[in-house]
Amino acid sequence: MALPAAPADRRLQPEPDEQLHLNHQDIGELGLPQEPDTEGIPLHSPWTFWLDRSLPGTTAAECESNLKKIYTVHTIQSFWSVYNNIPLVTNLPVRWSYHLMRGERKPLWEEESNAKGGVWKMKVPKEASSLVWKELLLATIGEQFTDRCAPEDEVIGVSVSVRDREDIVQVWNGNASVVAEATVLEKIYELLPNTSFKAVFYKPHEEHHAFEGGRSRH
């Protein structure tokens, strides 16, 4: 799916400290429609933007309570409305993350619709984080990974997490048992040939030591 160019942005500016105060009032001020958007070029499926802060040692309940839903987009136009009006990745404080998930699923390992899947995880230089995030978002909503997954699998999300030295990008899939058939990483390298990825690996959610078998963290 070819996506139109982004309109001019009007971003919220984050607080200067380690707290990013993007509350429901702020989200309302983004100028997004209050009802699901139906006008414009439809996406193949809806996608939901999420924001959270990840801290070591948090419980599953704390992880879920830290999640803040930004908006569910149904069209290319509403995607750009959200993307252009939330703080840049480079303005997020350390340990904060953005996620874009298929439908309204949450970026939690044990969410029922996620539990059998996993993520391709990689470190990226901070100066490349914004470009990598944008390109992976566009590839994801444009369904460019469809023919790179096994027939019984799909990409269900993408995340970017800010860390001290290098940031972390993750691409989520729904079925870890068939990941050997996937060429998702090859597609990522094709999309971003000039990016130096480090510590690249795939990990099923169920192999995380903190996987709780119910609903948990990311």
Curated annotation (Swiss-Prot):
Keywords: Initiation factor, Protein biosynthesis, RNA-binding, Translation regulation. It comes from the Eukaryota. The keyword RNA-binding applies. MRNA binds at W109, E110, R163, D164, R165, E166, D167, I168. Residues 1-21 are annotated as: Disordered. It holds the Pfam family IF4E. One of its GO terms (molecular function) is RNA 7-methylguanosine cap binding. GO terms for biological process: regulation of translation; translational initiation. Residues 8-21 have a biased composition (Basic and acidic residues). GO terms for cellular component: eukaryotic translation initiation factor 4F complex. The keyword Nucleotide-binding does not apply. Belongs to the eukaryotic initiation factor 4E family. Recognizes and binds the 7-methylguanosine-containing mRNA cap during an early step in the initiation of protein synthesis. eIF4F is a multi-subunit complex, the composition of which varies with external and internal environmental conditions. It is composed of at least eIF4A, eIF4E and eIF4G. This is Eukaryotic translation initiation factor 4E type 3-A. It comes from Xenopus laevis (African clawed frog).
